[in-house]
Amino acid sequence: MKQAKYLILLALLTAGSSGFAQKEYQFSVDLTQPQDDKLTVTLDTPPIRQKTAVYHLPKVVPGTYSINNYGSYASNFKAFDKKGRALNVDKLDKNSWKISKAKKLSRISYQVDDTWDTPEIKEDVFEPSGTDIEQDRIFVLNSFGFFGYFQGLEKLPYRVSITKPQGFYGSTSLVNQNKDTAGNKDVFVTDDYHALADAPLMYNRPDTVWLKVGNADILVSVFSPNNKFATKDLAADIKPTLEAQKDYLGGTLPIDKYAFIIYMSDRQDLTRYGALEHAQSSFYYLPESFSEEQLSKSIKDIAAHEFFHILTPLSIHSEEIGDFDYINPKMSRHLWLYEGLTEYAAHHAQLQAGIIDLPTYLDRQMDKIENSRTRHNDTLSFTTMSQEVLDTYKDEYPNVYEKGALIGLSLDLKLRQLSGGKYGTKDLMRDLAKTYGKHKSFKDDELFDKITELTYPEIRDFFRKYVEGGEPLPLGELFDAIGITYDPNGEKKEVEKAFGVGFALMPGTKNIMIASINEATDLGKRLGLEPMDQIVAINDQPFTMETYASVLQNYDEKFKLGDTVSFTVKRKVSADESKEVKLTADLREATVPYPTLTPKANPTQQELQLRKAWMGTAVQ
C-alpha cells in the first residue's frame, strides 16, 4: 500500500487518543450446538479504553442496495468483564448495542436466528444476502449476518473460529488457517471487517469441484437437497463462461482464487431467486425445481454477471464503497457502472466468445429495452436513482439490469464510433482499473470527468444527457452504426401464456380466487374464468399458497404452442352451493407490440467493420 510506513506510524501515534488498542477481534461459533434454530456467537473483544463502546451488526451491506437490519436477528446480547461479571448493555436501535464500563469489557455473546425461515421477524432479507441454520444439514453464513464490529474499529484484524459437524466442509474464498485437516475446527483470518463481511461461507457435506482458469483457482460448491444437480455439471456450464471472461479481460484475471457457492432450494413457495457478488466469491440461491436446461442457462448468465464484479467494484469503486458505512451508508451515483456495465459485459463477453450468437444477443437486448420502458421510469436520472435507491427509488433498482446494461451497451458503441472500432468499454475498464485499483477509490463526483479525460470530449455529453439526465438513449443511431435497425414501435409473435386476471385470497381463508377479469387476455377469456372462482388446480396441479409459485413456473417452462391449459375451479351456482368446474383452452400465438433489432440485409462496409470490431473480430 502506498505510504504504508507512514500510515503504520500514524496508527501507533494515534492509538491512545482513539480510545482503542490495536489488537484483533476473536470470534467463535459452534455449528454443532444450535438451539431453537439459533447459533451462539462469542467474541473475545479487543481492549477498549473508552467508558462506553457501541457494537453494530449491519443495517445495509454492499451489493444489496436495500435495508436489511441484521441486528433484528440477534437476541440475548450480553457483555462480560474478565471475571465473567455482566456489564450493562442498552440496545440503541435495531442494529446497535451500547456497553457501559467498556474499559472492563472482555467478552460479548449473543444468539443469531436465520433470515430464511423466521417469519416473526418483520424484515425482508433477499436470500443470497441472508443466513440459514439447519442442524446436521446445512449452514449458510453470510458473515455480516453473524459478526459485527465496534464503532470506529472496523479496520482491526479478525480471527473467526468455526466448530463444524463431522464430515462438513466450509465452502468460502477465505483460507483456513487450521492445518489440522482431520479436526473439526476452521480458523479464518482477515485484515478488517470489510474483508470478513465480503466472504460468505456455506457448511454442509461437500460436493465440490476445483477449476483452473488462467491464473486463478476456482471453487464450485453446490448444495442440492434432493441430489437433483451435481457440482460437476454446473462446473461444466460455468467454465466456458469464465474462460470467455478471462479473454475479455485481456487474458488474465485480477484474482488468484474465487468461490461459486450455490444453494439449490426445494421450497415449493419460492417466488424469487438470484445471487450476491463479493470480491472473490458469489453466493447463489436458485430453485431446485429448475429443469437442467433452465439451470444451465441461468447459471451461465448469473455467474457471468457476478464474476465480472471482480473488476468492479473490486478494482474500480468510489469512496462510498471503498470505506462503506454499514449503518448510515452514503449511496454512490454510479450504479450504471457497478451493476449496469457489469450486466452488459456479462452478455457481451458471451457474444464475443461465441457462447451465444448475434440473434440471441439481440433478443436479450430487446427484452431489456421493453422491460426498461414498461416496468420502470425510463426518464429518471440514473445518478439520482442510484443515490436514493435505499428509499425514494428502491422499486427502480431492478432497472440497473435493464437500462443500466443498455447504458453500458450505448457507451461501448459510442466509444467504438469515436475510435473507429479500436476502443470500447472493456478497454475503458482496464484503464480505470490501472488508474485506481483495489486500494484507491475514486471521488464520486469526478468519475465522469476522469472517463472523459481517458477517452473523448463527446463522452462527457453522453453522461450529461443519458446518465445524469433523463433523455432516451440514442439506440437507433448507435445500432445503425453497426448495421442493425432498431424499431421502437415494432412487434413480435409469441405464445400467449398470460391470463390477465387478478388473483387474491378468498375472504377469511387461504384459498386463492379470481379477483377480477377486467384485463383478461384472449387466453383468459377463452378459459371462461369468472370473478370469485376459487382455484383448485392449474393443469391438474393443486394451486395453494404453498404451491402456486412452482405451479406457475412449471406452466411457463413446459407448456408450448397448441398445448391445452386447464383450470379446475369451485364456482358458486347458488347462495349456498358451489360446483367444481374444469375449464380448458389451447395456447395460441399472438402478435404484440415490441421493440425490434434486425441486422440490415446490406450493411455498408463501414457498418460491417464496426460490427465486427464490437463482436470481437479485428478491424480489417
Where are the model-predicted features located?
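Early extracytoplasmic/domain-onset interaction patches
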Residues: Q22-V60, V140-G145
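Juxtacatalytic substrate-recognition/specificity segment
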Residues: L43, D207-H334
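Bacterial Sec-dependent N-terminal signal peptides
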Residues: M1-Q26
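Post-HExxH zinc-binding segment in Zn-dependent metallohydrolases
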Residues: A275, S282, S315-I316, I327-D378
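A generic secondary-structure signal for well-formed alpha-helical elements
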Residues: W116, F168, L249, L253, ...
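C-terminal recognition in membrane/secretory proteostasis and scaffolding
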Residues: A346-H347, I355-Q620
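Non-catalytic architectural context of zinc metalloproteases
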Residues: I67-N76, F80-I255, T271-G274
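Intrinsic-disorder/low-complexity, polar/charged segments enriched in Ser/Thr/Lys/Arg/Asp/Glu/Gln
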Residues: E24-Q26, K38-T42, T52-V54, L105-R107, ...
